[in-house]
Amino acid sequence: MAETKNLLLFRKWDLSDVEVVDPGLKTAISLRKQILPYTFGRSALKRFNKADVNIVERLINKSMHFGKKYAKNTGRMTGKKTKLINTVKTAFDIIALKTGQNPVQVLVKAIEFSAPTEDTTRIVYGGTTYHVSVDVAPIRRVDLALKFISDAIKEATFSNPKPIEEHMAEQLMLAANNDPSAPSVKKKNELERIAQASR
């Protein structure tokens, strides 16, 4: 048990110093200590096990699938987890050089600022469909934040000669500063604005 105290992510970053400020996300963001963020899909066996998966691995997993934009998704980054682990590792080095902070803390801040608190759902009442504002569950907040961040990274890299590592570092730093120009923060604000209009 004494050995787990010295486990550093990528043998560089200490996760014990990382703090989740948002009380709603404390249970949904896992900062479990491990050297390599790779659990070989063990979390897929039970429904909410993904909440126990290290947040860095969840970012990597989310980055492996772009969504349903066919032209940009075909054959790109699908299943290339080792490649993405190295990408995240390099992006974290860039973040550490530029900010002087623990890059995992920057990632957690980026998730906190990109996670929407309100969303809309459809309710059919008397044959008429209404959009109603609802609160978002903590796990879904993290899911949406990771989706927004990974989509922003891939949108930035598409048809761009700059390497993905630099784009990833840039997008995470923008989101961590709650920059309104960050695509992930923009999407979160847009979602909350639509939800507020549907109250």
Regions of interest found by a model, annotated:
Residues 1-85, 89-199:
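Strongly charged
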